């Protein structure tokens, strides 16, 4: 009997302790469980690999910088397309509208669409969602890009690569798309966050083509005005 | 000896009843709606969602639809708050529009508590806050329930072992609770589960009223990769990108991404696919929703400060949702939603000059930050 009482008292103390523990904190709060469901940290590698960071050229005070030459007006008519189908092409479309550019926009343009075009601005960056929405695979996209870029080369159409997505548009597939376009590019315009490892400035330096680094996407307005002559 | 046992049992019984009464009061409070001020002369009409989904009538999931019509015709904009009730900035944005906006042209349809049943409970073992409050300049206090992201199981039970509804989303194993997630079951079913009836009501409202743009307001924890992103259906990409660009030009570094083709049942996919409307969804950062947060507190929910996430940010372990010592207050999160809504209306008007959506009298971003929600929310009409 006495042992039962001791067990009951111990149980009561344990329960009280548990209630106090879960009820502690603010009046209407409880402690979060360590195993509570929720999203997990992903894609941290880009920010973890900062030891090999490239020199930063832009800042709030210096919103854009052109290396290896000067930013210049390119010849119209302009065409805007994507390689990789990320939403960055849509942002570039909004920017082009903002600066009052005259251009044709088709994110999935084919070589045959570029008749009479003088300058193609290509927003690079892979998006599985974008590819899915367009109903094409990464391989289809590469084939389209290859055909388009070869057409540009054969018809003296200037290619400008635009990389506006920063670090979120770096990675294996995004870099594969960017590499395809870089080989045909006469100029690069990019948000500098995407050049943390110096990939694009190194390429521009090797090929001696101008690269315009931009602090934030909102700072694209002025460089675009120069490119389209507005 | 026997009398002693009887007395002891009676004391224990009374103690248990007392505990039930005390805790029951808290549970019952969650079923009491938080009033919304209707003193704004810009409010034209308040209808119930059951007008668009009759099966909701008389249920805990039926919810108010506030309609603010402009004097001039124009586009129609639907603001959804409380799709996930614990994502509080979305609901507060909707309430701020209801209580302050004047529509000059076009029409606003606002559902502040899209999943009304979700406001009647919190998620067990998640350590959530149940109620937040704001003291207004007149001394009155506005209370808002926090709720949780799913319909209350006392309103929709049991969850099936397997479900494959008309959203195209297959639910099995641990996913079956998502049958009570409003943002997994669009376009809904007029004869389906309670949640699907809400989905159907919103879907039917969009079709019946010929809504042009849908804005589904959400919040997410810091680990979520699309914090401060507008997710837009392909039909909404042009207007969405223009809106996001304008927010960037105003100093708000938001981004846009396209809705995934397989985001079955989510508003930005399913409502975009099944209606004529441009479907968008925006996520603000709410550290209280992160799984690595510290103890739940008022400072965390309203101040948006969490030392764990500041530390995680400082170690460079986040690629989205970075948090500084300044935190991200409920004022700022609600302001971000307000700005995104405003810029979507502006971008729509720019693209459709014959059907503009023009809204005035909304506090500015700086008003939200400097004056706070306590000066933007209106006292409740007596």
Regions found by a protein language model. Name each.
Chain A
Residues 25-28, 51-72, 194-230:
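Charged, low-complexity C-terminal accessory regions
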Residues 96-116:
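A short, well-structured beta->alpha microelement
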Residues 71-98:
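Short, charged N-terminal beta->alpha structural module
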Residues 15-19:
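Hydrophobic core
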Residues 132-156, 204-211:
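A short, gly/pro- and small-residue-rich
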Residues 6, 20-42:
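Bacterial lipoprotein signal-peptidase II cleavage site
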Residues 170-192:
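Short, electropositive alpha-helical surface patch
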Residues 1-10:
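Bacterial N-terminal signal peptides that target proteins for export
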